[in-house]
Amino acid sequence: MIFDSLTMTQSSLSLLLLTGAIFSISALYLTLFHRCATFSATSDLFLLVPLKFVSRDINDRLKTHYHHSCLGSPFLCIIFLFISPLLNYHFRSLVRPPKIHQKGSIPTLTKNAETRCSHHLKQAAATGEVCKVVVIIKGHILKDCSIFFFIIFPLIYPLFINCSSKYNGLQ
């Protein structure tokens, strides 16, 4: 029983490390190559994930905006599939990408983002355009994840493996 629990815990820690690494690499990839996120310990991570709504009624749009038809990078799909259940993110509002920016370039939101998002949502509901949902991950969560996955976890994981292997040798 104890061996089984140790094996399960070891597998869980390995999965945790893998998902953390995927998240961190994804955030850095988006920041460096797609310019659609800010990765900093003091700022928030803003991701604009393309979503298409099938309903033409604004109330239905608000209810069904979790329907994913992801048109972006595979890294965004990885974040949604593996990382989003683990982090305290929320969908703040819906926006259209500004026309002044080039394709693939998404600006960081300002303090008036929610007002602009509300305006864009109403405008998109009237025109039936493809919207983008803003996923906001707090900067301190990014900082804590980075510290844990790249500093603390590599230090404690070998100790855990060593202890579990010694226990297995006693069996």
UniProtKB/Swiss-Prot annotation:
The keyword Nuclease does not apply. Disulfide bonds: none annotated. Its main location: membrane. Residues 92-140 are cytoplasmic. This is Putative uncharacterized membrane protein YBR224W. Keywords: Membrane, Signal, Transmembrane, Transmembrane helix. Residues 25-70, 162-171 are extracellular. It is a multi-pass membrane protein. Partially overlaps TDP1. The chain crosses the membrane at residues 71-91, 141-161. It is found in: Membrane. One of its GO terms (cellular component) is membrane. Residues 1-24 form the signal peptide. The keyword Ribosomal protein does not apply.
